[in-house]
Design a protein with these regions (language model features):
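Low-complexity, highly charged intrinsically disordered N-terminal segments
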Residues: 1-11
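A polyanion-binding, active-site-adjacent surface
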Residues: 9-182, 195-196, 210, 216-222, ...
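Tryptophan-centric aromatic hotspots in well-structured domains and transmembrane helices
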Residues: 138, 167, 190, 245-248
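Extended, basic/helix-rich recognition subdomains
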Residues: 181-204
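C-terminal accessory segment of soluble enzyme catalytic cores
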Residues: 198-248
Length: 248
């Protein structure tokens, strides 16, 4: 298999048609695609978040993260989905913990001050599904967990910037497709890197978008706002069904 054909192996045909020219014409293409072991996630998982978008559904929620998890076993190709975590009793990263804590707060069954032990008890008492089940069900309901950068190589700022620069035009093409194929798109920005796409969305000329902003879930001030309530408020305003986050 030639290096140039690797995209056909890891992108579904529709997305290959939409994204391949942007990727193949990037001067850093070889750097990103000729060494399968250079970065996380595994190459076959890099486009998971894109390949599983159901374009037939006219209302979409796009949750922007920043970078993949810096561990091969954790990086899934989706923002915030940590593949290493199979049970709520596993060690949770701050981002993962705060994301689900915020969902519980939105239902009034948790408080900002609750520690991890109390959160686990609440999850057990409510018989809430596993972490993997949550993400799988949300994806089927067309919640799109999209990182601003699709790959991670190292924590050096120069590397973070290199990856972000490579993926930025790709993410822009994805955004255009989502706006073209949808009645409404709710873009959820968690973290400063993802906010850089706001101006691009506005400048596309489309009017079918809505914004939800918050800090990154790794920080405790993530709970100063509740993005999950904000998403449902927008859905209610545009006469769409609200999302039952605990029973997606």
């Amino acid at each position: 298999m030639s290096e140039k054909n690797i995209l056909k192996e890891i992108l579904k045909p529709y997305w290959y048609e939409k994204l391949s020219s942007t990727i193949l014409n990037n001067k850093d293409y070889d750097y990103f695609f000729n060494d399968k072991d250079r970065f996380f996630p595994n190459l076959e998982n890099v486009f998971n978040a894109v390949n599983n978008i159901d374009l037939e559904k006219k209302t979409k929620v796009v949750v922007f993260g920043q970078d993949p998890y810096p561990r091969k076993e954790s990086a899934t190709g989706y923002a915030f989905w940590d593949g290493k975590i199979k049970s709520w009793n596993d060690r949770l990263s701050p981002s993962f913990k705060n994301l689900f804590k915020s969902i519980l707060i939105s239902y009034g069954v948790a408080e900002k001050k609750d520690n991890i032990a109390k959160l686990r008890k609440t999850i057990s008492d409510k018989a809430i599904f596993s972490p993997d089940d949550f993400f799988e069900k949300s994806i089927k309901n067309n919640i799109i967990w999209l990182n601003a950068s699709f790959s991670f190589e190292g924590k050096a700022q120069s590397l973070l910037n290199k990856h972000l620069k490579f993926w930025k035009p790709v993410v822009k093409e994805i955004i255009k497709v989502l706006l073209e194929s949808s009645d409404d798109v709710i873009f959820v920005f968690w973290g400063k890197k993802s906010l850089k796409f706001q101006k691009f969305i506005i400048d596309t000329g489309y009017k079918n978008y809505h914004f939800v902003e918050n800090g990154h879930p790794m920080l405790e001030n993530f709970h100063d706002k509740n993005s999950f309530n904000d998403i449902n408020e927008i859905l209610e305003k545009i006469n769409k069904n609200k999302i039952d986050w605990l029973n997606i």
